[in-house]
């Protein structure tokens, strides 16, 4: 496919984007809004953002969800701006500096919350800055300006949502149905690999792919939940399927590890059963029936605990899978499965990374303020706004540098494109609403094609071009003002890029160490006799951390294996029949306190000291288990955990 070719699958969204832009433009001028540009820009960003992230037409619900986040972020930003202006209107410089800190604070929060919700916080940061900068000449108009901005942004979002609904939004349900079936087959094939106990790299690749596919299915569930309330029952089932899928991965990998020391535990009967190849979910269903008959015949005690648990989880998966595909009423049996254990929320391991993002955004905004005041350039304020926009949006993504480059390319492309519209197209079409709408529809259509291809600079070009062409009421054509706006965008993006390069983010290794220590803490916390604590479901949180580790350190198999081993240890200890007495309960609390100290230690020396203390306490704990005559189902997992911590002590304590 050539660089300028148009694929059939890209046309529908391009038309949808063009329709959103035209609708926002028409409504803006029809209701005599002062700056219809904001409504048009909002419609374009809300519609095109999910498409750029997805690399194609976004699923139904994604545009609506992004629109809701933009409304929330705008209102938070407006309230913050009004508060800052009311309290500091007599000190303009201090007011702007506080806005810079607010933008950094919002970026810090957006780095810690869920990725899908971080957009609202990033937006609220630079919205406050835009309002404070814009009303410098007339601060008494702040309430009116804030209301106008909120109104026009809401209009733009409504137009984007209407365009999405008008062109039959793409449902994610069929993809969910296919993936639910495919995931079950892949789970069975992973267990086949683990039973064979073949090449470890092949097994690592298989479980790594399954972790990613399970995370992707959870993302699809979020999209399905946003799509329509009628998928509520399917959404409940998919939540439970996420935990069941992670349980299947854990049991399969533990089966592989068990055979390193006790290959005789997997009998020939089960080896023969798993030699049969499977291609479809129906094949897996047949094999599970055979497996349940074998377990009933051999008895639970003669069946390896990992295979017994795996068969139970796979059976529940099959039960819920049928309900997801048919979206039928939840049966009594399904309700028992869905009334599972409370899911523990994950604690962010990226606090240092979030603090780096805070300083990047704050320093870049302060630098923009100093540049504006020093030069007195009329578009210094525009440059400052672009600095805030780029840093606020770039910091929450995995590669901020490439986001900044995308904005630079986009603003550079917007200069000639905006020049064409400013000098030729808009002056000749402003007398006709039809021609004006058609001209912007053409812009939206072709840039919509490029956005879906994730062309570098396409998203920045769309937003920057709309931002600098004259879409105000009334239209005024001042070339110097246009040129200042275009150059201000370019300078602002370049300054943001420079700050991102200068303020280095060295938090990757620290984040990796914190993640590994959180796995250790989770495994240690599983050693408890507290009934409520033992019922907590840590699997989604642990695998979410593992997924983050895989993204931070792609290809680092030793780290992945260590993390997976800790997850397996957590699950095994959670189900272990630990003797119930006050002596062990008190020591469990001591172990958890020491593990927490390891995570929160401020330097390597303290961390090594607390980690050494944890290892000593584990040795004491093993002795206590022998005194209290704990069964092998308890002592063996604790011994394996202690051995792993001794083996990887340096990886878990050194930066």
Swiss-Prot record:
It comes from the Bacteria. It is a multi-pass membrane protein. Disulfide bonds: none annotated. One of its GO terms (molecular function) is transmembrane transporter activity. One of its GO terms (cellular component) is plasma membrane. Keywords: Cell inner membrane, Cell membrane, Membrane, Transmembrane, Transmembrane helix, Transport. Forms an efflux pump with AaeA. Could function as a metabolic relief valve, allowing to eliminate certain compounds when they accumulate to high levels in the cell. It is found in: Cell inner membrane. Belongs to the aromatic acid exporter ArAE (TC 2.A.85) family. It holds the Pfam family FUSC. Its main location: membrane. The keyword Iron does not apply. This is p-hydroxybenzoic acid efflux pump subunit AaeB. The chain crosses the membrane at residues 13-33, 38-58, 69-89, 93-113, 121-141, 152-172, 370-390, 407-427, 431-451, 459-479, 482-502. InterPro entries: PHBA_efflux_AaeB/fusaric-R (IPR006726), PHBA_efflux_pump_AaeB (IPR023706). One of its GO terms (biological process) is carboxylic acid transport. It comes from Citrobacter koseri (strain ATCC BAA-895 / CDC 4225-83 / SGSC4696). PANTHER family: MULTIDRUG RESISTANCE PROTEIN MDTO (PTHR30509:SF9), P-HYDROXYBENZOIC ACID EFFLUX PUMP SUBUNIT-RELATED (PTHR30509).
């Amino acid at each position: 496919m050539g660089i300028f070719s148009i694929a059939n699958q890209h046309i529908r969204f391009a038309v949808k984007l063009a329709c959103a832009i035209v609708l926002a433009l028409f409504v803006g001028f029809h209701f005599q809004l002062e700056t219809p540009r904001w409504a048009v820009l909002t419609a374009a960003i809300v519609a095109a953002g999910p498409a750029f992230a997805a690399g194609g037409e976004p699923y139904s619900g994604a545009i609506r969800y992004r629109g809701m986040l933009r409304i929330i972020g705008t209102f938070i930003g407006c309230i913050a701006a009004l508060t800052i202006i009311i309290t500091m209107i007599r000190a303009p410089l201090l007011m702007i500096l506080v806005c810079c800190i607010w933008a950094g604070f919002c970026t810090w929060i957006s780095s810690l919350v869920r990725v899908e919700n971080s957009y609202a916080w990033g937006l609220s940061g630079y919205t406050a800055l835009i309002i404070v900068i814009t009303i410098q000449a007339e601060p008494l108009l702040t309430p009116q300006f804030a209301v106008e901005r909120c109104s026009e942004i809401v209009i733009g979002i409504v137009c984007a949502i209407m365009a999405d609904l008008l062109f039959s939004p793409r449902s994610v349900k069929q993809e969910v149905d296919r993936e639910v079936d495919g995931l079950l087959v892949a789970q069975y094939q992973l267990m086949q690999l683990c039973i064979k106990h073949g090449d470890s790299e092949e097994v690592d690749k298989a479980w790594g792919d399954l972790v990613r596919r399970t995370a992707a299915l959870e993302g699809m569930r979020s999209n399905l939940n946003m799509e329509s309330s009628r998928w509520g029952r399917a959404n409940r089932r998919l939540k439970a399927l996420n935990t069941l899928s992670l349980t299947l991965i854990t049991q399969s990998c533990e089966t592989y590890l068990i055979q390193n020391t006790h290959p005789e535990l997997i009998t020939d009967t089960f080896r023969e059963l798993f030699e049969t190849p499977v291609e479809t979910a129906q094949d897996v269903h047949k094999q599970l029936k055979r497996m349940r008959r074998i377990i009933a015949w051999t008895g639970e005690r003669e069946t390896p605990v990992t295979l017994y648990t795996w068969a139970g989880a796979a059976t529940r998966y099959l039960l819920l899978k049928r309900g997801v595909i048919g979206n039928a009423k939840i049966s009594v049996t399904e309700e028992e499965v869905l009334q599972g254990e409370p899911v523990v929320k994950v604690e962010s391991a990226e606090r240092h990374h979030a603090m780096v993002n805070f300083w990047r955004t704050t320093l870049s905004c302060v630098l923009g303020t100093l540049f504006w005041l020093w030069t007195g350039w009329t578009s210094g304020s525009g440059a400052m706004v672009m600095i805030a926009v780029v840093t606020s949006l770039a910091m929450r993504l995995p590669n901020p540098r490439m986001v900044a480059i995308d904005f630079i390319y986009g603003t550079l492309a917007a200069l000639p494109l905006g020049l064409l519209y400013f000098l030729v197209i808009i002056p000749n079409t402003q007398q006709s609403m039809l021609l004006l709408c058609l001209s912007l529809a053409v812009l939206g259509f072709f840039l919509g094609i490029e956005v879906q291809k994730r062309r570098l600079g396409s998203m920045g070009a769309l937003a920057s071009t709309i931002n600098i062409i004259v879409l105000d009421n009334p239209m005024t054509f001042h070339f110097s003002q246009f040129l200042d706006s275009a150059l201000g965008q370019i300078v602002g993006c370049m300054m943001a890029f420079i700050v991102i390069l200068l303020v280095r983010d060295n938090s990757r290794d620290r984040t990796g160490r914190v993640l590994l220590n959180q796995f250790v803490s989770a495994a240690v916390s599983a050693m408890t006799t507290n009934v409520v604590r033992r019922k907590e479901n840590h699997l989604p949180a642990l695998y979410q951390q593992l997924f983050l580790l895989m993204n931070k350190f792609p290809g680092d198999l030793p780290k992945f294996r260590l993390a997976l081993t800790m997850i397996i240890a957590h699950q095994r200890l959670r189900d272990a029949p630990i003797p119930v007495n006050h002596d062990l309960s008190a020591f469990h609390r001591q172990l958890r306190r020491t593990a927490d100290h390891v995570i929160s230690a401020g330097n390597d020396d303290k961390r090594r000291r607390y980690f050494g203390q944890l290892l000593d306490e584990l040795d004491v704990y093993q002795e206590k288990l022998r005194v209290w005559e704990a069964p092998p189902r308890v002592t063996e997992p604790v011994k394996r955990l202690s051995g792993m911590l001794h083996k990887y002590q340096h990886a878990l304590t050194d930066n």
